[in-house]
Amino acid sequence: MNFLSFKTTKHYHIFRYVNIRNDYRLLMIMIIGTVATGLVPAITSILTGRVFDLLSVFVANGSHQGLYSQLVQRSMAVMALGAASVPVMWLSLTSWMHIGERQGFRIRSQILEAYLEEKPMEWYDNNEKLLGDFTQINRCVEELRSSSAEASAITFQNLVAICALLGTSFYYSWSLTLIILCSSPIITFFAVVFSRMIHVYSEKENSETSKAAQLLTWSMNAAQLVRLYCTQRLERKKFKEIILNCNTFFIKSCFFVAANAGILRFLTLTMFVQGFWFGSAMIKKGKLNINDVITCFHSCIMLGSTLNNTLHQIVVLQKGGVAMEKIMTLLKDGSKRNPLNKTVAHQFPLDYATSDLTFANVSFSYPSRPSEAVLKNVSLNFSAGQFTFIVGKSGSGKSTLSNLLLRFYDGYNGSISINGHNIQTIDQKLLIENITVVEQRCTLFNDTLRKNILLGSTDSVRNADCSTNENRHLIKDACQMALLDRFILDLPDGLETLIGTGGVTLSGGQQQRVAIARAFIRDTPILFLDEAVSALDIVHRNLLMKAIRHWRKGKTTIILTHELSQIESDDYLYLMKEGEVVESGTQSELLADPTTTFSTWYHLQNDYSDAKTIVDTETEEKSIHTVESFNSQLETPKLGSCLSNLGYDETDQLSFYEAIYQKRSNVRTRRVKVEEENIGYALKQQKNTESSTGPQLLSIIQIIKRMIKSIRYKKILILGLLCSLIAGATNPVFSYTFSFLLEGIVPSTDGKTGSSHYLAKWSLLVLGVAAADGIFNFAKGFLLDCCSEYWVMDLRNEVMEKLTRKNMDWFSGENNKASEISALVLNDLRDLRSLVSEFLSAMTSFVTVSTIGLIWALVSGWKLSLVCISMFPLIIIFSAIYGGILQKCETDYKTSVAQLENCLYQIVTNIKTIKCLQAEFHFQLTYHDLKIKMQQIASKRAIATGFGISMTNMIVMCIQAIIYYYGLKLVMIHEYTSKEMFTTFTLLLFTIMSCTSLVSQIPDISRGQRAASWIYRILDEKHNTLEVENNNARTVGIAGHTYHGKEKKPIVSIQNLTFAYPSAPTAFVYKNMNFDMFCGQTLGIIGESGTGKSTLVLLLTKLYNCEVGKIKIDGTDVNDWNLTSLRKEISVVEQKPLLFNGTIRDNLTYGLQDEILEIEMYDALKYVGIHDFVISSPQGLDTRIDTTLLSGGQAQRLCIARALLRKSKILILDECTSALDSVSSSIINEIVKKGPPALLTMVITHSEQMMRSCNSIAVLKDGKVVERGNFDTLYNNRGELFQIVSNQSS
């Protein structure tokens, strides 16, 4: 057979990443060990022939005199060979696995480098299946590793063995060997044809799996949106359709795999028939003796067995080839090594601090949208050491400026220069070292808060000992400047608190403050702030802007903003519109001309009532004093007393840094105030009930029981197992008929061999048994593969169904990362297929063969059988020890793989932030540390696997040697005839082979065992992790006409509400809160950070349960509402807009149950002021959205339009204007002012303009409503609302 054809695909072979220079020692050991191991079967054949040659001597002499000693020596030679093969085979397999691991790590490093260094930003923009391909590529790495390790080891050992066996067979009789192997061309033909079909369908299955991974990852990342829009069924339906395609392609692949196996078994078993005829004739003619014939037959039998064993490995090699093709496509697709340094002329540092920054006639279109000009002949000049503002509508091209400045995109017209030097001639690393960009959509990583803050620093600071005074002061200054100090003091572990999954989830405002702290530590000459404080409340926003002005005095600072009040009179600004600069000048100059667009926008945003002119002088003075005393100690009532109130000042023995760095176990638990600008973002300290290593592994018996209980086609499973039983039974039957053929060529005492009639009869029987064997092996392989695939498909769908029913708190669990669950469901579950298709089959065959074979052997020759049976406890004990060791190794290995892939997932999903912060080295270091840990575990696994396989082989050869010795001895003492000996011997040999094939399944079983345990962990988790549905719940919607009468009744009523998050049960968000909301209200929910504004949305939509007190909607307790019916009545627009990579139409109609007219979509788009953007897009509503390139304002307005199209009775806007420009904000403000098409509109906001648009205000503080009324009244009362709006702190 052409083995190499199975290890190549196109130009990429699976050993592409073997480095001969570095691996030559390992390769030498591997080659020597492989050759030596491959020679073992041939040597065994020779030794076996020598053993049975004593039989012909005994028959010829009629006496056993002098034969015992030779029998002992020749039998023990087989045993000695088995013992000698242990270290050789162990070294060989271990070295092969090490080669595979080295290849795997090199490929992972190449993938890391490709993601971090080589892929341009346009590649990320164009890749719609980024996360799906990410999941798939991780599986490909593992398949390639497996194919170049265990599979290649076995294949090449078998290849050596085949060559050696052929050589041995040819040596003893070339003519007999050629006769036996005359059917090999047919075998090769079928193998090649079927392998090509397997390759085709494997590729198709991988492609569909990638789509499924993309969908699953998105649905987990957008879990809140999926629940609010009641699209769980839609997501499950889409997932089910993709998984069904995976199922179809895999089953077609299985058909060809099973057909190949069945035909190969039939042909290899039947190729001996012609050999027996020829061998018998040669013996009769005296041209061959029995030793020659037995040696040839044994060699060819082992050759056929070797080919059968290689078949499964060839399939693995094919998958490895497909995997390599996929990996190389990823590495080569769009990759440009150092793409932005092609014309580097100046790699010396410029004096950025005194350099002007200039955009000259710059025009640009994103590569993914070449027909849409984002910038049109833009010319800008940013003076060194000055503050410059850029304002403009959402989508006007403001954010694109920073992308071009940092050279994330190339191919623009015009020039960008620093101090006259074109940035194309400046090393990109130098640019990023001297320019910091803080994005509106800032990113935090799943790490400690300290590491997140230091991520913006130089490598020396980031990795330095944080106990040094210099770094302590650096952290302290950054936290104080970014207004983080009080928040950090309230965290459970201070700066060492884990952020993200498994730890604390920060709100949008807190994330932005961490991003500002990063920028402070970097302190680069040029700072680019892109809506960097938009998510903050008024108090923190204004304080932070003043702090930024103090910090950046004399440094080049460019601020992109929609908040025009941040611009001072002498600040220079540019106003952009539709990619062009339409106005420029200082604020005072532009305001002096009432015809300017800026003047119109400014007055539009600042068109307040006379109450706004009421300014508390004392408040202003405090604000000024705050900035002036920034470097010493913050003195505002909000922050200045933070340290002193807690007993920390400069004279304390416990410094501020120590207070926030260490967990304050001596401080009594108190309420943690958390900003809640985003729905569902609250402080949630995860309390894991499981260790980080995951759930306890289920036993094989438990998994099989659950499989049998849940498998879809039980009849097919039974039929498959029945075919497996019959296929298993054909082995001893074949052995039995085969023994008669052997008997036919052994000369009797009169020197005669079997007659032609005798050989013809048993030859036909052998052919019949071989045909039955091939048919039933095909049937059991195909049927069980189908059953296993349907089981896996059903498990995937069950998991998806469970994921869409999980409550929101579940997604913050440490073991519930989207990337990890996606890999588990789409990748690791493949390993579970082998439990049905291979383990159950092997177990059934083993039980059948053992039962039938051993009973038959006992009947045929009980003495020899009992000797063999006495060896079985050795196999059982060893299998148990080997299985236990390998199970731990496999579990640890998979866990380490998951950790490595989670690190890579963070890189892929946050690549722009990493590049902006020059954090590549940090992530490379983190990745390297995880890789070292994984290498250590992989090494242990390689040693354990090599040990297990080599010891199994030794045990088999030892048992074989004992059977040889005792069987021939029984013949020599006339207790057995040669026929009885051959019959018993072949039956026992096939039984042992079946047993060892079961042991060889242990690595696959261990992998499948882990996958099943983790999957059933998700399926079996406690009921409190699911959203609970009340069977008798209300399904009737809110009837609007019932609120038009004279009697005024609340549409929402909150009564004695007390609530704390399950993860922080002692930190009460609400304490006995009461208030009502009425039809026709546009109710503004106002409060400082941490007062529970967004938590109210979570309770109204029942994303969290209300257990103390009541929330009634339309007179019905939310706990008595049907979840879907309730959420259909409420539309929520989140602060962070969430869209998916699809058309504008698909995003607008997401979650809608009824058909909607196109004109209604356009009306909604006009309503929110984004109609022009949509109609100017290439395909209008059918234009595909690139979520990474839409501006925050554009995405937010699409989300508002989507919410309006739902026509819900209650509309909730959660900081929905934070990303909008003044014109767009005014449009939304006007909508709110006039009253959106809803019975009740709730507006959570920090914007004064939005507050004034509401006809009613509710102010929250300390878990209660402290003020109710309209804005003007509450403002003039100088109460809590006045303090929030005017920056006065209580």
Curated annotation (Swiss-Prot):
STE6 is required in yeast MATA cells for production of A-factor pheromone. STE6 is involved in the transport of the farnesyl-derivation of the A-factor pheromone. It holds the Pfam family ABC_membrane. Degraded via the ubiquitin system. One of its GO terms (biological process) is oligopeptide export from mitochondrion. ATP 1 binds at G392, K393, S394, G395, S396, G397, K398, S399. Keywords: ATP-binding, Glycoprotein, Isopeptide bond, Membrane, Nucleotide-binding, Pheromone response, Repeat, Translocase, Transmembrane, Transmembrane helix, Transport, Ubl conjugation. It catalyses: an [alpha-factor](in) + ATP + H2O = an [alpha-factor](out) + ADP + phosphate + H(+). It is found in: Membrane. It comes from Saccharomyces cerevisiae (strain ATCC 204508 / S288c) (Baker's yeast). Changing K1093A: 26% mating activity. Residues 357-603, 1052-1287 form the ABC transporter domain. Its EC number is 7.4.2.7. This is Alpha-factor-transporting ATPase. There is a cross-link at K1022 (Glycyl lysine isopeptide (Lys-Gly) (interchain with G-Cter in ubiquitin)). Its main location: membrane.
